[in-house]
């Protein structure tokens, strides 16, 4: 690699909204996220259905499904 053209690659702490944090390496100085593997429903096994403003009901009504 050429000298002086690449950004610094530092160890950073990734902070999740759930309170979990872990170390990784990045060119950024800090990283925050809303969902991580500790709180994501796929990884925790706590799947939940999110029905935003009755979209499922509107779909069923529109296409005649009961």
Swiss-Prot record:
This is Large ribosomal subunit protein bL31. InterPro entries: Ribosomal_bL28/bL31-like_sf, Ribosomal_bL31, Ribosomal_bL31_A, Ribosomal_bL31_sf. GO terms for molecular function: metal ion binding; rRNA binding; structural constituent of ribosome. NCBIfam families: L31 (TIGR00105), PRK00019.1 (NF000612), PRK00528.1 (NF001809). PANTHER family: 50S RIBOSOMAL PROTEIN L31, CHLOROPLASTIC (PTHR33280), LARGE RIBOSOMAL SUBUNIT PROTEIN BL31A (PTHR33280:SF6). Belongs to the bacterial ribosomal protein bL31 family. Type A subfamily. Binds 1 zinc ion per subunit. The keyword Transmembrane helix does not apply. Disulfide bonds: none annotated. One of its GO terms (biological process) is translation. Binds the 23S rRNA. Gene3D superfamilies: Ribosomal protein L31. Its cofactor is Zn(2+). Zn(2+) binds at residues 16, 18, 36, 39. It comes from the Bacteria. Keywords: Metal-binding, Ribonucleoprotein, Ribosomal protein, RNA-binding, rRNA-binding, Zinc. Pfam families: Ribosomal_L31. One of its GO terms (cellular component) is ribosome. Part of the 50S ribosomal subunit.
């Amino acid at each position: 690699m050429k000298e002086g053209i690449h950004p610094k690659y530092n160890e950073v702490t990734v902070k999740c909204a759930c309170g979990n944090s872990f170390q990784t390496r990045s060119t950024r100085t800090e990283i925050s996220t809303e969902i991580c593997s500790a709180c994501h429903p796929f990884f925790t096994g706590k799947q939940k259905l999110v029905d935003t403003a009755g979209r499922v009901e509107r779909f069923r009504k529109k296409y005649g499904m009961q």
